[in-house]
Amino acid sequence: MLSKELIEKNVDFVLQMPTLFEKIEHFLLAGNVTEAVITLQNIASFKTYFSSIFKRAKFDIPYDGDDLVVIANMLGIDTFRAIVLSYFIFLKSPKIYKVFNFKIVDLIELNAKILSDWLKILNSFKEKNYNYLSLAPYSIACIIVCENLFSKFPSCMSDVISYSDVSYNKILQKKHGFSFWDIFLKAMNMNKQSLSKIDKEMLCFFEILLSYESSRPEFYDFGVDKILDINVYPEMQTIIFIKKALQK
């Protein structure tokens, strides 16, 4: 049975970062990307993951080699940090998915697309608020938490959700007062009651992006659109802004 305690336990499990991440964070905060890469480059699973994200995200950098130090420095601190963060979250992923219709490699594909498109949107603003780039990897955390919570239920539940306007988020909200958006807020150290104007704006843009990505033909069958209640009705100006950003 689901309980508030079980929900919080799963959220804490997925968001908990190892001491290795703290070490890397120390280097990145000091602006030392090279040392951060050196700390990770002998970890085979990270090299494979990083390569997979880099190839799929198609970051616009003029380099075709495979030197991690060169790539990371060209990507910049914020983008490299987002990839590292997503890697440690990805390590918490179950190997087999029951709630969502994808394999673990599809999670990497989705992660790469959300990250690269979110970066394009952030790059389109005059003021570059790259601290919000972390929203992208935390979207993967939501998928993992949702899978962990609902995978133990009968498959017929997934069928009901698939053919109705009910979302996993709505179930948790009504039963336990929990929203998957709380994961983003907790991870980003945001307080729902005291969000700044820029916080609200960035969360709104990111919500629109998640709606867009989950409805893409290549991702729609995954079922991730059933995690959150996407209740944004953007102005035409906002839609045009996002469309132009994603075309770059």
Q: Locations of the language-model features?
A:
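Terminal helices and disordered tails flanking the catalytic cores of nucleotide-processing hydrolases
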Residues: 1-8, 194, 224-248
